[in-house]
């Protein structure tokens, strides 16, 4: 059966499709030629008028030279063109029991029988527009591979990053989020480098906006990349993470990012009250149109390991359980969501993604705001490792995992697979 691809290598705005659409989207009919038999049959023999599929000819049915009225009269008189025979019923394997069919009023498999109907009735779709591409940046000139994340790099902010963004845009991914690896010499206990207007992130934003004005840039608002303690907030001498003082620093960081040209600031710190404080700070500086994507339900997960290696941002002591959410909790996500909504969040994010599909669905059902899901580094690395070891089909599992996040209710997905998945959706492999 011949197929016509709906995507090509140069697509810059590909359509949506399902995870298995390669096999059926855009199919051509396998009936390439149609002809009508010239013989007449007896008037007493009445049969339905059909046309025969032919494998030869020029693809056009042979005309009989009759008017519509003459054709209708011929059929009414029983002079019907020859039709193909009724196809035989496919044979069952030898030994199949002969039974009375089940008396079922509904057989859901009927709607799954054909690739065409499966495509028509598909409830969830996915496209490159749904992806936000997380990119790691550093001060160096070279792109450094991240050992725990095959295929991911710390990109040189002036060269490698620009090239990677160009690749993503070519396949329809026009949203990115930046994560900096900050030199140790610039880190301190209060994370002051986070709001340096000439720091790595603001410089990078200005560079990208100069080259790609329509690129949507999300930024991370948190102190851990800038903190000598590796925590998301200021640490008191007794180990307590100071909430309000941290929020003060985060407000300055968000304003600095907005000043550089960020479109969406994304507080990932999980401090109480930070969304409202950041909203007020942005508005006071004239950045009313800068959006806030709040990490609403960020769990104290074990899936973050590769990310922390990438940024060298592991906490120097303890863990993050006093501010990130308990993985055992469900209802608590509603408390966070309601607070973030009331404080002015524009997007609510759940992190990690696949292990927390129930939380994504909960927020989707309870909130009118757009929902984001973060397919985190651990999720990415597990799929990559399984693919390298030939234990799974990497591409199929990748696409299925992303479709599951969409099905659960995510409007956008932060995923390290963004470029690879979008390339797949465009019908080419990287």
From Swiss-Prot:
EC number(s) per entry: 4.2.1.24
Cofactor note (record): Binds 2 magnesium ions per monomer. The first magnesium ion is required for catalysis. The second functions as allosteric activator.
Compositional bias (Pro residues): 82-91
Effect of a null allele: Embryo lethal when homozygous. Impaired plant growth and development.
EC class of the enzyme, as a word: lyase
Keyword Cytoplasm assigned: no
GO cellular component: chloroplast; chloroplast stroma; mitochondrion
GO molecular function, one term: porphobilinogen synthase activity
Pathway info: Porphyrin-containing compound metabolism; protoporphyrin-IX biosynthesis; coproporphyrinogen-III from 5-aminolevulinate: step 1/4; Porphyrin-containing compound metabolism; chlorophyll biosynthesis
Active site: 298, 351
A Pfam family recorded for this sequence: ALAD
Residues annotated to bind 5-aminolevulinate 2: 377, 416
SMART domains per UniProt: ALAD (SM01004)
Residue range covered by the transit peptide: 1-52
Annotated compartments: Plastid, Chloroplast
Cofactor dependence: Mg(2+)
GO BP term, example: porphyrin-containing compound biosynthetic process
Residues that coordinate or bind Mg(2+): 336
Entry comment describing in which tissues the protein is expressed: Highly expressed in cotyledons during dark-to-light transition.
SUBUNIT field: Homooctamer.
Function (record text): Catalyzes an early step in the biosynthesis of tetrapyrroles. Binds two molecules of 5-aminolevulinate per subunit, each at a distinct site, and catalyzes their condensation to form porphobilinogen.
Recorded family membership: Belongs to the ALAD family.
Name assigned to this protein: Delta-aminolevulinic acid dehydratase 1, chloroplastic
Upper taxonomic lineage: Eukaryota, Viridiplantae, Streptophyta, Embryophyta, Tracheophyta
Gene: HEMB1
